A protein has these predicted regions:
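Conserved donor-nucleotide/metal-binding helix-loop-beta segment in metal-dependent transferases, i.e.
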Residues: 98-137
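Conserved glycosyltransferase catalytic-site signature
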Residues: 72, 76, 157, 196-201
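Active-site regions of enzymes building and remodeling cell-envelope glycoconjugates
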Residues: 53-64, 76-78, 112-114, 230-233
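A glycosyltransferase accessory/donor-loop signature
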Residues: 2-6, 146-153, 164-309
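Short, polar loop motifs at secondary-structure junctions
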Residues: 43-48, 100-102, 219-222
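A conserved donor-nucleotide-binding helix/loop in the catalytic core
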Residues: 24, 64-104, 116, 260
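Short, flexible, basic/aromatic active-site loop/helix in glycosyltransferases
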Residues: 136-150
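N-terminal anchoring/stem segment of glycosyltransferases
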Residues: 1-70, 84-85, 273-276, 280-309
Length: 309
């Protein structure tokens, strides 16, 4: 990492199912010399997982308040935490890893802007009807809305960088999540819903219609568009690499394996403590199973739900 002063706190969160993801995320930072302070929101973690993540240093573990909403809906609550004393805050989803030293991408060029990726072209659910709902809800709960949307596409929020001067905006985002999303919402809603991507959609609505929202930065470099040796790798779709490998996630094996090896070499975890999907000897099996993984995963989840009943 460069010699400059650390000016960003990285924030992430996960329930029990994402604890290994959070460990991989923070480990990827430390492996690449990114010694930024990290806040991890958690719920349902074992003491062993808490110890493993804390052992990486500079990590504050915070038990999330009780909520029936998915963990991702607590993004703004964690990002505006009073314990953050850096100029910038970066949200990073816990199903991800940093490749290379990404220090440069953890700060914005302009404190008046939010760094977040925009979809281009707009997704199918970015309709006039959904925009009308966004505008209506901003008018209803926020005291007024822009006549027209600032943007013609919505945002993608696994990686966000914002200056701490926007704490009030984060508070508005948090309130609006409670205002417009169901109290028991999961990570996504019915396809076509104005708030299909839950907290991400709420954030998009504010950036489009809230008069005093930050502008979206034109430059988004965390996806490797500027430097392919330094980027934020987001493991989209289920199952996740620590659970089961699928055809999509196979491309991330070269990102995940070095982080797991680093954890082993530095005594942060033992081989027999790793999930089977992260054990080197099991890789041929998971690679062969990958095409069927989504169906196996759905069947496993269905079985768990049935037995809960």
């Amino acid at each position: 990492m460069s010699e400059r002063k650390i000016s960003t706190t990285v924030v992430t969160a996960g329930d029990r199912a994402f604890a290994w993801g959070a460990l991989l995320l923070v480990a990827s930072m430390r492996r690449n010399g990114m010694n930024h302070p990290v806040i991890v929101g958690m719920t349902g973690w074992t003491d062993d997982m808490k110890s493993r993540v804390a052992s990486l240093g500079g990590v504050t573990l915070k038990e999330l308040p009780p909520s029936r909403q998915c963990v991702t809906c607590q993004k703004p609550l964690l990002m505006m935490d009073d314990a953050i004393d850096t100029e910038w805050v970066c949200w990073a989803d816990s199903d991800a890893a940093f490749v290379g030293d990404c220090t440069e991408w953890l700060c914005g060029a302009n404190p008046d802007e939010i760094v977040i990726r925009r979809y281009d072209p707009p997704p199918a659910d970015f309709t006039k009807e959904n925009l009308a709902v966004w505008k209506r809800d901003i008018e209803k709960f926020c005291g007024g809305a822009n006549a027209e949307s600032r943007y013609t596409t919505r945002v993608n929020a696994p990686f966000i960088v914002i200056n701490r001067k926007w704490k009030g905006f984060l508070e508005t985002w948090n309130r609006q999540i409670q205002n417009v999303l169901p109290p028991d919402v999961e990570i996504i809603m019915k396809h076509g819903s104005p708030y299909f991507q839950t907290d991400e959609s709420v954030l998009g609505s504010l950036l489009c219609f809230l008069p005093d929202a930050p502008k979206i930065a034109e430059r988004y470099a965390a996806n490797g568009s500027v430097d392919k040796s330094r980027y934020f790798a987001h493991f989209a779709y289920n199952p996740k690499p620590w659970q089961m490998w699928n055809s999509y996630s196979l491309k991330w094996h070269g990102v995940v394996r070095p982080v797991v090896d680093w954890l082993l070499e530095n005594g942060r975890v033992k081989t027999d403590e790793l999930p089977l999907a992260l054990r080197k000897g099991w890789w041929p099996f998971w690679r062969a199973l990958a095409p069927a993984a989504p169906w196996v995963w759905r069947a496993t989840k269905l079985k768990r739900r049935l037995f809960k009943k």
